[in-house]
Amino acid sequence: MDRQEKKALEFRALHAGKAFVIPNPWDVGSARVLAAIGFKALATTSSGFAFTLGRLDGQATLDEVVAHAAALDEATDLPVSVDLENGYGPDPKSAALAIQRSAEAGAVGGSIEDYDPAGRIYELHHAAERVAAATEAARGLRFPFTLTARAENHIRGHPVLEDTIARLKAFEDAGADVLYAPGLRTVDEIRAVCEAVSKPVNVLAIPGLSFADLVAAGARRVSVGGSLTWVAVRAMADAAEAIRDAGDFSALGARVPLDEWLA
């Protein structure tokens, strides 16, 4: 068994066991820290990675994303799942290619969403065809690639729960291994989604609700999206603004155990 197959099997086993948190590093350093802290798997963040390039979410290319995935895969022994946005193209072939390219980079999982960067949600039948193509690509690999299908309604200005559930059910029928609707805001919404499908559901962490709350509502996997990136960036900006405005260097006294984290 090679390294990638081992990671793939570990990732599948996580989804078959107790609910877990999959944090989202934005670069190799943050991936190493999260691994050292004790998390069992990692997922990329499209917004966090785009920030490292000085760009907004959605402005990284497939080539850049798979290179980033390869770097994270090499950085730790943890399984890596890749945020593949819409597959970097509107057609099913693009979704399939994104899965293949991420697998070639070392990833053992990836997500495909139903949002067109031009500003619309794909029609349901077309969105399901894209998931089916991604599923076919995943099943053609030599290891069990875990495909997550995302319904973007709730973060794209169309928070209609009934439509979101219909989409996730269609994606389940199309072969997705994990289902995900980022932007659900309440326990009742999460519970409704989880009860409507049989595959594991990923839930985006919600400030004010604990991991236990999300698991009680049915979540099997909890991710944090770009939030850890913004925690770090906000801390840097706050320290920099204190220096600019008051000549206050007090925030610079923080020390971190790099020898331990990067051992």
Task: Describe these PLM feature segments.
Residues D2, F11, S227-A263:
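Extended, intrinsically disordered, low-complexity segments
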Residues D2-V82, G87-V224, W230-D238:
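Alpha/beta enzyme core
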